[in-house]
Amino acid sequence: MVAVIIKGNEVAEKKRAQLTEEVVKLKEQGIVPGLAVILVGEDPASRSYVKGKEKGCEQVGIYSELIELPETITEERLLAEIDRLNGDDRINGILVQLPLPKHIEEKAIIERISPEKDVDGFHPISVGRMMTGQDTFLPCTPHGIVELVKETNLDISGKHVVVIGRSNIVGKPVGQLFLNENATVTYCHSKTQNMKELSKLADILIVAVGRPKMITADYIKEGAVVIDVGVNRLETGKLCGDVDFDNVLDVAGYITPVPKGVGPMTITMLLHNTVESAKRAGVVCK
């Protein structure tokens, strides 16, 4: 049996086409979704991510605003910029590109963003609402992962989901989202003693650890859905995931590739959250 490849780029394009239609309808009502992205410093990777977000906004018809600030900016000045955007009716979503310079406390910055504009889903209020199953902006990568699993038409309810990794950005929230879908969830991490045995119990395996090709066929239950969140660059310059794709291909039922797997879904869910925020605000642009 060879696994079915879940092509995240194709799923993302399909969802972006749906978002484009929604944005057209909103604009007919005088509502223009708007996303502001704050970029501090000149980190090339961050700039590349921001460019992808701008391109996504342009594709679906979202107004985007890039605020570029020097690496030397004070925390107070950055907080003031967020306050300005919180009060700007043209802006439905605010995203601060991480990481930030060491002299700025990320927690304080994230908490300053209005929960109504927290399209990244990182604000403590958003996290609390997610934990209790309330309507909120879901974190983009975890939300994208759940959407990819749903593409397999597998009934998530009652399935055993194993999450390898416990970061605040992916591991912890993705487990909670699957719990909200009535799955049974097990977390594995660096201190887990029997990771291989646990991962072999997974109907759905989510891997987000940042270690190239760590997960091999002997970690996989036959027919499992395998979602590889890792993006690692080998010495050859080639990108690979945390899962040894070729090794696992004959055991898994479904698998995401790297690249063109989870990555394209992250920005797509950010666009989704921005459109949802615009719908909730319902502010007609003059």
Curated annotation (Swiss-Prot):
Cross-referenced InterPro entries: Aminoacid_DH-like_N_sf, NAD(P)-bd_dom_sf, THF_DH/CycHdrlase, THF_DH/CycHdrlase_cat_dom, THF_DH/CycHdrlase_CS, THF_DH/CycHdrlase_NAD-bd_dom
Record's catalysed reaction(s): (6R)-5,10-methylene-5,6,7,8-tetrahydrofolate + NADP(+) = (6R)-5,10-methenyltetrahydrofolate + NADPH; (6R)-5,10-methenyltetrahydrofolate + H2O = (6R)-10-formyltetrahydrofolate + H(+)
List of residues binding NADP(+): 165-167, 190, 231
Keywords: Amino-acid biosynthesis, Histidine biosynthesis, Hydrolase, Methionine biosynthesis, Multifunctional enzyme, NADP, One-carbon metabolism, Oxidoreductase, Purine biosynthesis
Superkingdom of this protein's organism: Bacteria
GO cellular component, one term: cytosol
Signal peptide stretch: none
Protein function: Catalyzes the oxidation of 5,10-methylenetetrahydrofolate to 5,10-methenyltetrahydrofolate and then the hydrolysis of 5,10-methenyltetrahydrofolate to 10-formyltetrahydrofolate.
PANTHER family, per database record: C-1-TETRAHYDROFOLATE SYNTHASE, CYTOPLASMIC, C-1-TETRAHYDROFOLATE SYNTHASE, CYTOPLASMIC-RELATED
Family statement drawn from the similarity comment of this UniProt entry: Belongs to the tetrahydrofolate dehydrogenase/cyclohydrolase family.
Subunit structure: Homodimer.
NCBIfam families: PRK10792.1, PRK14186.1
Official protein name in the record: Bifunctional protein FolD
Gene name for this UniProt entry: folD
